[in-house]
Swiss-Prot record:
Entry-linked SUPFAM superfamilies: PH domain-like
Gene encoding the protein: Mprip
Protein name as annotated: Myosin phosphatase Rho-interacting protein
Assembly behavior: Binds RHOA, PPP1R12A/MBS and PPP1R12C/MBS85 through adjacent coiled coil domains. Interacts with MYZAP. Binds F-actin through its N-terminus.
Domain PH: 43-150, 391-487
Amino acid sequence: MSAAKENPCRKFQANIFNKSKCQNCFKPRESHLLNDEDLTQAKPIYGGWLLLAPDGTDFDNPVHRSRKWQRRFFILYEHGLLRYALDEMPTTLPQGTINMNQCTDVVDGEARTGQKFSLCILTPDKEHFIRAETKEIISGWLEMLMVYPRTNKQNQKKKRKVEPPTPQEPGPAKMAVTSSSGGSSGSSSSSSSSSIPSAEKVPTTKSTLWQEEMRAKDQPDGTSLSPVQSPSQSQPPAACTPRETGLDSKEDENILSGDRVDGGRKVRVESGYFSLEKAKQDLRAEEQLPPLLSPPSPSTPHSRRSQVIEKFEALDIEKAEHMETNMLILTTPSSDTRQGRSERRAIPRKRDFASETPTAPLSDACPLSPHRRAKSLDRRSTESSMTPDLLNFKKGWLTKQYEDGQWKKHWFVLADQSLRYYRDSVAEEAADLDGEINLSTCYDVTEYPVQRNYGFQIHTKEGEFTLSAMTSGIRRNWIQTIMKHVLPTSAPDVTSSLPEGKNKSTSFDTCLRPSEKQEAEPGEPDPEQKKSRARERRREGRSKTFDWAEFRPIQQALAQERASTVGSSDSGDPGCLEAEPGELERERARRREERRKRFGMLDTNDGPGMEDTALRMDIDRSPGLLGTPDLKTQNVHVEIEQRWHQVETTPLREEKQVPIAPLHLSLEDRSERLSTHELTSLLEKELEQSQKEASDLLEQNRLLQDQLRVALGREQSAREGYVLQATCERGFAAMEETHQKKIEDLQRQHQRELEKLREEKDRLLAEETAATISAIEAMKNAHREEMERELEKSQRSQISSINSDIEALRRQYLEELQSVQRELEVLSEQYSQKCLENAHLAQALEAERQALRQCQRENQELNAHNQELNNRLAAEITRLRTLLTREGGGESTGLPLTQGKDAYELEVLLRVKESEIQYLKQEISSLKDELQTALRDKKYASDKYKDIYTELSIAKAKADCDISRLKEQLKAATEALGEKSPEGTTVSGYDIMKSKSNPDFLKKDRSCVTRQLRNIRSKSVIEQVSWDN
């Protein structure tokens, strides 16, 4: 019991009688796989890249529909958890988990999301929206995920009432899921008698290949076991023959032997999908497993789990250069032997193979254990068609050259039949495609020298695409990958249309140089060569030029015939050489010496070269064949007939066309356009050379005639030495006369033929000249058209660049104009404020002036009042003095006390008056000071007004200059663009009549001045009242 607690059951396996209990420990499912370590040991059964809607997205809200979906790598595990992470590495922590055991339904999400190929996973907690790029991928995911809601619904119906509801149900690892290329899928039933309808068939998707490979490798017998079918629907499958078992064993041995290349190295996964392939060709079969009760093998689950874990760890410990090694592996129809991708799987697979082979059934009657059945529930049925080689799926940074010669860096992704390129890897995740290269018509990938980096060209029927890589290794890797991708299906058979005599080592080099074309054998050129030549001429600006190679087969045939004829004539007759070798050598030496002497001379009598050469050959043979004089005469007639036949059958254009062939070849080799004068001079040189050859042949004819006479005489004397000399002389004279007549006839005929040949030569020369001129004209026209196209193209590009520059300048000028207008408005506003302040200052100055005038008036009034008081005081003093003098005489003794009192009062009154006068003087002086202060303020305000006015005038003048300058620039830009200059460009300025006044300021000034005046007046009135009192 303690051992059981220390070693709990680490893997849940559904009991065949109660699906919610484990068949090993009979504990509920929730007690298994509780921590992350257990979750990492779970077996993944499906995976791939999908797009996930962000959390909190409400697709009923139109604003949320424009949210960007997140690209994540989803992995569905056997325990029913659907996890998604940022990449496909098993060590990456998942960003979220969807518990498919609680899923209620998986429905199409296009109606809600507005996105194609989207699904909605409904759970009690929330809704999850996923989306794929293609219909095949989303169909495969729908097929896998639909198993869970069906299973959950059926388990809820079939549950026993005494059992408490469990939060998790058996995952799809316990269901039979067919491959997406042709198998059918369904959900497992709680009892063996029920079945679920199989899902819709979908084609193979990239995200399922790695899972199908693991299923194929887990089954050495090559079959997939599916419990979907009911006993009534299932049919007995074909028995596994020893031959099939041996084939699978051989294939596994190939994998085990070929997977020890790179152990312990880490590779970056080049593809967005798991780059795991099938190790062998699958066979379509489905088997129904009856419920068996035999105990399972305890070692098999651990080996299966360790195998899956090491398969996923293999993705994390491969190296980047491993992709290059995989490009060189050859694929066969029976197996896909792959090296390097599964080297870490070699030892676990050997252990797994050893543990499973004894239990593999060989016939339908072989019993299987319940553990075997449980293990078979998570396998998919295999397919018979070969899956695409995922090693060809490659991505990386390359630089592409565009038509204008500019290079731009892109993120390239190699897909099925296309090479797509994006702005970067983020754009690839968002499916933001920049362009695509169709590889279905690609027939070659070659290295191409470029100025920077390492370039290569992809040759397709649509054209050539120039790319470049950072290093030569990366370039070689890409070339091998693309070639391996396109060669098995679309590589053209270059050697099929070439002549047998041509060198077979030249493949994909169809554009021969002119010197190489001259050596090639005549025949119909390869269509690919024609296209390549056309492309070469198009690149060189000669797409419509005349092809001189059309004349070459006839010229080559004539040259070969002439060479063979001359060779045969030089060889001579063997009998003659044996008879008289020394004399023949001397004759030939003499002829060569005479020919060298006459080489520079021009003879008027021209003769056909081929006829004279053949005549010389036959005449050299004739001395050894003649016998009697009758035979000699007959032989002469026969030779004459033969010479006539030879003249009639000799092609007349041989002399004309053979010399012209070098002209054509030289024209094509140099690719120069000769003028008519140069062509005529060349033809004249060729004619002189032909005339020299004709004169040489005539001279050789005369020599041969002399030799013939000498030989005939020597032969006659040798054979008929005893014949009378007269008879010999008569016969010889008759024969010589006849022969001479024939020779004269032949010469006359030869002269007539020579005249005809000259006329024909002149006519053909004229025709060739006209043809050459027409060809040169065609070349000139083609070159002119090409130049016009290039010029038009360059003009268009220049105009577009100029338009863009002008548009940019116009935008810049408009922005500057707007900024100047804004500055002018600010200055105008400041000017308005200054003007308003000046107005306020002027009003304040005017108020000060009025107050000053009022003060002056009051001062005058006070002066008058003071003068009046002084006058009154003087009068009063005078009156008192007179009174005192008058009363002093009469009442000096009687009223001394009264007089003293009156004098004191008067003295006090006088002092008061003097103090009042003093106060008034002080007030007058203070008023004078205030007046001076007011005058100073006025002067300061006027100076400030002048400074502000001057500053504003300068600013306005500067703003006017800037506006006029910008108007001129804008006018020049609009004239350059061909538009009408803007009229009525208004600039807001300051209007003194429109400026708002500030009444509060005036009121404040007025109230201040009035308050001061009021204080002064009140003070003077109080003093006056006190003085009166």
